[in-house]
Amino acid sequence: MRYPAGWSTGADGALRNPHLSTLDAVVLPIIVFDRVISELGSSPGRVRVAAARLRSGAVAWTDLASVPVAVSVNGDEAGPWELTGTVGNMRVFVRLEGALDPHKRHTVASLAPAATVYGGAFRQTTTSSRLMRFEPESRTLIGEHRTKWDAKRIRTEAEGVESAWRPALTVIDHLAVMGQMAQSVIALSTDASRESMGTLWMRAIDIDAAEEPTVAPATWTSRMTLLRDRELRSDGLHDVRVQSTASTGVSVRASLAYTKGASS
């Protein structure tokens, strides 16, 4: 696994060694599922991600040259499907809903990761966000988000999970935006600068998608609430709980941590 140069930086802009991300922990089991279903001779195009549960290891996984993926796939043609296992040292559960299409067949070669939504096509959307309002009493931040499709690639074919809705928002789009919103609501609630927060890292995330994927381009809103921010140790380690709801029907609950005053 490789990340582009400058993928991970500190608050001061200094480069850091990248580590396995929560986005990878969602994507890799779905890539496995796409391959399994392809080998069975069916299409998962109308199968969507309904929920995901991620639990991190005690330390970040930094050996990106060797990321073990162990996934168990359980379900039937009508769905739902459950993917359970580990990615690196993260424990992962993904629930997929929707029926397979046994009449639309693809070869294993056609479902190479880069040809699927979660294998690579999800990168063809970009989201810009605008902070609309902060409510200090409830520690809630409201944001407006605009997700666009790369017009140069709009005709590019893709297969795999959620390809029937393409181009559309994926849970990856939501996780990326929610991470940014979490950083902002913590900074606003504690009257601290982003730089003084150091690195914010995930300890546990639960994401639920109540509706079918929202087709892009789309404008949507979210509400991010800081439920808890308490200092655990004298070195500035903070334990954080946040929850978020979006107009797209996606909700996120997360346990996070950061060390106040750390910049790397």
Q: Model-derived features: where do they sit?
A:
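Non-catalytic linker/capping segments at the edges of enzyme domains
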Residues: 1-12, 87-169, 237
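Hot-dog-fold acyl-thioester-processing enzymes
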Residues: 1-42, 148-197
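Residues that cap or initiate secondary-structure elements
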Residues: 7, 60, 77, 149-151, ...
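Accessory, usually C-terminal, subdomains that scaffold auxiliary metal cofactors
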Residues: 9, 155, 198-201, 206, ...
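Short strand-loop-strand
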Residues: 12, 16, 135, 204-206
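Short, low-complexity cationic-aromatic patches
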Residues: 19-22, 60-64, 168-171, 213-217, ...
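Hydrophobic beta-strand-centered segment that forms part of the acyl-chain substrate-binding groove
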Residues: 32-74, 184-227
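HotDog/MaoC-like acyl-thioester-processing domains
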Residues: 70-122, 219-264
